[in-house]
């Protein structure tokens, strides 16, 4: 019987492509191998008929350069013979999509097309070639090494890089931006202008509202004049809607507010389902910055004071964001010159939980947790759209015409991810893999043009901050027959990221010999060595596998675990030579690139062994988990909702010990969960040392024949790499 003869009878539409029907077998009949037939049918029926044919590599390259598809500056770094050889080697790897979703995602979102959208101009191998040419920056031998890492799915650049590398008409290579807004009209106006510029260049932008004076605060000493933060949120939401990135999608933005800002309850109310249209915020993401003191007050069932940012600045000469509310809480409380209002701390957390059930927002950044880990002198005051970027920033000052009086430091980050399963399979090449990944992200930071946002350009040029992450943890665990909620899973996560951290710091230290140190290195905990005490001032066996299973896995894959002596030597080298990058690791959600790589997202468990996605006109697409078969199925059977928040938090906490930034941590709750259950999850994540909480996803009760169980939320495609 042929593949097409196996199409199930329930697909009766005459124009329905066979690959849709074949993919449906994955869910309807549990025949996971049929998804590979769907890939084959998709390539034959859809891709090949729409792919422009060239008779030689030279003809193709000449066409793409002449017609402004490829950037000749990238092409000209190499001889034609080198380009031809890299292309030949790329195709020699005989890359195959592991599932239908991976093929669909590539051709729908990444492949270069003619300007009229009618013809494909690239296969996966061609896109990888353009990435390695760009990331190797003219170094032919390095391009060949990178080719191996990317085309075997060991390392995956973030969407903005993978999509835009080598293109003549492109967006930026940078995934996300973070901007401070200070308490004056010039800063507000400049932030909106910068937001428009960054959003149209495909970036997701997060902005800080903590320092804006509250509603009713004085203006020019006249009381009850300020409108507070809500009108600014409305302006920002309209700006993101207008800058719709060449019509492809609406711009993505988030705003962060400190929990002790007087407008915090109105801030949360903007996401209420029944909010008045005058204040309702539909597409802007919300984030809360919550310090330790808030949890203490809630534990003691006390009132929490909300402090006027206007008065704090007048009294201390510092914005509210730049002080530790936990350390200064009782001083601020006693200061009669600081206006304050009060709400019940437990009521505050109950409201946060209610909003999570209604909308999935707000994100949560644990203020004191991230600042205790901060190796740098200035405070971390916010995060990004996916809550994995945590870096210090400093304010800018402006003239009345919005020109800069003083350029502060704002934040960008260059992202990419290791595929944990493939990285482990790299064995003795593990260190080279991490080194090449760090060098690739560093290159992106050095070639990105961020002149439209001078404060971000300054932050990037001084810090070259990176965010190397990881994905496919559940995939690796399941294929090695380890349950996600087992001690072995936590043990593996701990040792894996311990090993990645060592090689990442080593790579950046070696880069510093070539590129120089990041600007303020001498004032950091890296320079005095104290950051590395956790690896050095411990017993020799402290950072070693605690289970025989994990010890055996590292031996099986021949991945060497760094020793305490390795760290001692590295710490001394870093003190001597410095680091090229202020930040190295951050674990993003990896939505798109996980589908592209046919692997499980980030460190999260799968929602189910076969995920159901809704993709435009195609309708439902069924996505089997990484290497799903009868052997791995039991280890995928309990998905994120069945597992609940505790195992996910345990995994994130294990990794967070070694990640110098944060981890996009999504909590999954069933429809039976209560606000009390959510509050327990916040407290557990807080106590375990997690840096942040991303979305809260709630599986709702739905009609029996519906498969859309989860609250759908707008996500930043630039950030959910």
Swiss-Prot record:
It comes from the Bacteria. Under complex allosteric control mediated by deoxynucleoside triphosphates and ATP binding. The type of nucleotide bound at the specificity site determines substrate preference. It seems probable that ATP makes the enzyme reduce CDP and UDP, dGTP favors ADP reduction and dTTP favors GDP reduction. One of its GO terms (cellular component) is ribonucleoside-diphosphate reductase complex. It is an enzyme of class 1 (oxidoreductase). Its EC number is 1.17.4.1. It catalyses: a 2'-deoxyribonucleoside 5'-diphosphate + [thioredoxin]-disulfide + H2O = a ribonucleoside 5'-diphosphate + [thioredoxin]-dithiol. The keyword GTP-binding does not apply. The record marks 694-695 as: Important for electron transfer. Keywords: Allosteric enzyme, ATP-binding, Deoxyribonucleotide synthesis, Disulfide bond, Nucleotide-binding, Oxidoreductase. One of its GO terms (molecular function) is ribonucleoside-diphosphate reductase activity, thioredoxin disulfide as acceptor. Disulfide bonds join 176-413. Pfam families: Ribonuc_red_lgC, Ribonuc_red_lgN, RNR_N. The record marks 716, 719 as: Interacts with thioredoxin/glutaredoxin. The record marks 176, 413 as: Important for hydrogen atom transfer. GO terms for biological process: deoxyribonucleotide biosynthetic process. The record marks 183, 213 as: Allosteric effector binding. CDD domains: RNR_I. Substrate binds at residues 159, 175-176, 204, 384-388, 589-593. The active site is at residues 384, 386, 388. Tetramer of two alpha and two beta subunits. Provides the precursors necessary for DNA synthesis. Catalyzes the biosynthesis of deoxyribonucleotides from the corresponding ribonucleotides. Belongs to the ribonucleoside diphosphate reductase large chain family. This is Ribonucleoside-diphosphate reductase subunit alpha.
